[in-house]
Amino acid sequence: EMATSDIQATEMIDEEICIAVPDGHRFADCGAVSLTELADDPFIALSGSESFQQVSEHIFRSAGIAMHAAIECDSLALQSRLLSCGMGIALAAAGEWRQLCEEGSVHLLHIRDAECRRYIYVQQLSRFETHSMRAFRAFLRRYFSKIG
């Protein structure tokens, strides 16, 4: 937990960001890949989440390449559908994509050439906490423990 004056932040999840590739992709069975090896692959960007877009751009910059989206979509459901149809590759939060991987239509690969994690925090803006706020924080902990 982090605290600054009256603002308190609690980490809900620390999650690996992977590269998601469709079944049949040349690296699908590799386990890990360098972003530079995928520089020419069409990239499916998730534009509906500003924070995930910032994380994505940081990951590509860390690997020394620019992110060029061939397709932009605003929902995870559409992004995963396009990916499983073989339309490109995507950055994926490992927990959120676990079910697709179990179905076999998508493979998650560790990224070798960049720091690839995301952290989600909940901030409490004052020390005053209602029963509803505590219940909501407990709900978030349960939710993120299932995907993390």
State where each predicted segment sits.
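Short secondary-structure boundary segments
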Residues: 1-2, 23, 93-96, 120
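Short beta-strand-centered segments that line the small-molecule binding cleft or hinge
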Residues: 1-21, 58, 84-87, 107-109
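Short Pro/Gly-enriched coil loops immediately N-terminal to beta-strands
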Residues: 7-23, 31-39, 111-119
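Structured helix-beta-strand junction loops
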Residues: 15, 30, 40-41, 63, ...
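Residues embedded in well-ordered beta-strands
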Residues: 18-20, 26, 44, 89, ...
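Secondary-structure junction motif
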Residues: 27, 42-63, 129-137, 147
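Hydrophobic hinge/microswitch elements
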Residues: 49-107
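A late-sequence structural motif
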Residues: 107-148
